[in-house]
Amino acid sequence: MLLCVAAIATRAAFAVLPVADVGRVAGRVLADEANASVALAVALYLILRREARAAAAAGRGSVLSGNLLLVFGALFCTVAGYFALQPMMEAARAGQGGVAFGTLHGMSLAFFGLKTLLVLALAWRLGPR
């Protein structure tokens, strides 16, 4: 999902829409992605927590597994990169706030990129063994 948002959806908007409309379309796509990311992170947390507890009870690991840390990291990137920065970006776009829109946009992009890497690492760890 993350790679589709980054590689297809936002690029397609830039290709076919006027610049004034691209921000609205990309914002909507990213809002949906952020909400889906939170829901998926909660679901993965519940599944992986059960697995980590079973492994810890069998003496094969910790209750706080590396997979759980990757989920927490991706969730943090979603909360910080979208839910915290988005209101600040709106204020900056309106000429309010102390941080420039471009700086906030760059920070948001960095969180999205880091989240993508964390999710790819989790997929690799959970893949066929």
Give, region by region, the residue ranges found by the protein language model:
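Interfacial segments of alpha-helical transmembrane regions
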Residues: 59-75
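Individual transmembrane alpha-helices with interfacial aromatic-anchor signatures
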Residues: 29-30, 67, 99-116
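Short, charged juxtamembrane terminal tails flanking transmembrane helices
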Residues: 125-129
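Hydrophobic cores of alpha-helical transmembrane segments in multi-pass inner/ER membrane proteins
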Residues: 36-44, 111-122
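Interfacial loop at the N-terminal end of multi-pass membrane proteins
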Residues: 1-42, 46-55, 93-98, 102
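Mid-bilayer segments of alpha-helical transmembrane spans in multi-pass integral membrane proteins
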Residues: 72-87, 112-116
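Hydrophobic/aromatic residues in alpha-helical transmembrane segments
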Residues: 9, 85, 119-122
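Alpha-helical transmembrane segments of multi-pass integral membrane proteins
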Residues: 1-4, 36-37, 71-81
